[in-house]
Amino acid sequence: MVDYHMHSVLSDGKNSYEEMVLMAIEKGLDEIGFTDHVCLKPVTWAIRLEDIPVMTSQIIDLKEKYEDQIKIRYGIEMDYLPGKEEQINDIIERIPVDYVIGSIHFIGDWNFDTDQSFYGKWTNDKLYEKYFTLVQQAAKSGLFDIIGHIDIIKKFRVYPESNQDLLFEDTIKIIKANNLVVELNTGGMDRPCAEFTPGYKILEMCYKHHVPVTLSSDAHSNIQIARHFESAIELLAQVGYTEIVGFKNRIRRIIRL
């Protein structure tokens, strides 16, 4: 089994890469991917751009050190910021990544993932429209391999007033058209929403439109690695998935469940 989304002390995690590797081995994982935050905005929870060579060196060293025990992939979780595509691409091209997760944490300058003060500025329907429009733009950008926690806008139990299935499905169609993967992120179970991201409805849409998925815990400490995976695998099977995907050098491969 794989866990493709985790953070170290270089961004907003609590453990070193090696501590994460050792726990993943202890938990019996076959493959993990490190995905520290990279963001063009001046945030405290992302790796400093000048520290990217340190990140690269540490991960490459661990790949070699533990190659007989576990596969280690080098990913990043990159914030998508509209209008910054060229700068984002410049960063990605300098890093020998196996895959890139594209995530949305900002609507304009508002970090909705940490700052609850602007909730209520718009109707929830309008908020969802703004958020998923950004997801669609990220998918069309050609920058990413995986869309991260696709419905994270629900994190603080903020849900649309009316049915948004058309918005969700249009987003999934765009993701499919641009040959991207969606992660089933189990970290949502430990957030206020207490749901996987995506939840059942959007995951079912992914399956309907033949969008591949991968599996991730969004671990910010070593004890969170592979959290809720048993339930996640059951959900994938319930929806109809029999396989997930992994990456190496930004090339996908199939992993049977």
Region roles according to the model:
Residues 78-120:
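Hydrophobic alpha-helical segments and helix pairs
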Residues 10-11, 102-209:
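Domain-core and long-helix interface of multi-subunit machines
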Residues 32-34, 100, 147, 182, ...:
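Hydrophobic residues within beta-strands of alpha/beta enzymes
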Residues 1-82, 94-96, 154-166, 170-171, ...:
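An N-terminally biased module of ancient metal coordination in phosphate/nucleic-acid-related enzymes
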Residues 25-26, 56-69, 89-98, 137-143, ...:
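Acidic (Asp/Glu)-rich catalytic clusters
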Residues 183, 213-218, 243-247:
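Conserved active-site loop/cleft motifs that coordinate metal ions or position small ligands
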Residues 13-23, 83-91, 129-140:
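Short, acidic/polar
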Residues 236, 240-257:
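Short, basic/aromatic-enriched C-terminal tail that caps enzymatic domains
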